[in-house]
Amino acid sequence: MVVNILVVNPNSSKSMTISLQETIEKTISKESCEISYFTGPNTSPPQIDGQETSVQSMKACLPVLTDDKGSIYYFQKFDGILIACFSDHPLVTELKDVAAKEKSNVSVVGLLDSSIQYCNLVGRNFSIITSNKEWIPILNASVQSKFLTGNTIDKNLWKGTVSTDLQVLALHSPDNFQQIADIIRDENLRKLDSEIVILGCAGFSGLQNKLAKKFEKEGTLFLDTIEVGLEILITMIKFVRSQK
């Protein structure tokens, strides 16, 4: 049976949504998933670069997804919702709370929680590469306070966050690829001794294979958070359906 998923880009950049769609269509079978895409309204920021814009985007998106039952984006019309922003985005928690109050079985995941849980299960050294420097303390605090297992902490597998010092929309530019690769080599691999590098921003979407090829000799695993988030979401949906 086909699962019905909504991918939410909580910022107002339509180009980012198009990039997400292009990446997803290359990796997820249309035979198994029907995927719709939502871009934040004009009241959402064009890019999310910290806590303030995260909250702003949540306040802009939540009413569109939960208030109008006739909307094509009404959350209960979907089996699952992926919030495509790499952060502890408040929209994830808010949607889960609304779903719980309305006793809905819709599954909701974000990119940060799903990718960190994947790394917890794999059990290898991992770190994050992100966009601007403002994200370093935010992501480190979120990961350390909410998402690490006891085993990951005991084995010191979590190595921290590295910034490219680039804005979100600049990450996808081919002109910046070498700069990103150099930072990963110097910081994530050599300095932090990471075996897994989480591509910690939706702006990295589609770069997983290119980076894997660049670092083939090192054997580094690059985690495309969109792909991991979707696969985990699909598994959650199938499990919920199996209980019916």
Regions found by a protein language model. Name each.
Residues 1-3, 241-244:
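Eukaryotic N-terminal targeting leaders
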Residues 8-10, 38, 128-131:
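Short hydrophobic segments within beta-strands
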Residues 37-63, 168-174:
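N-terminal beta-loop-helix "entrance" segment that forms/cooperates
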Residues 56-99, 109-112, 195-208:
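N-terminal glycine-rich phosphate/adenylate-binding segment common to multiple enzyme folds
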Residues 95-122, 214-233:
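Short, acidic/small-residue loops that bind anionic groups at enzyme active sites
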Residues 122, 188, 230-242:
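Short, hydrophobic alpha-helical segments
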Residues 130-202:
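Active-site rim beta-loop-alpha module in soluble metabolic enzymes
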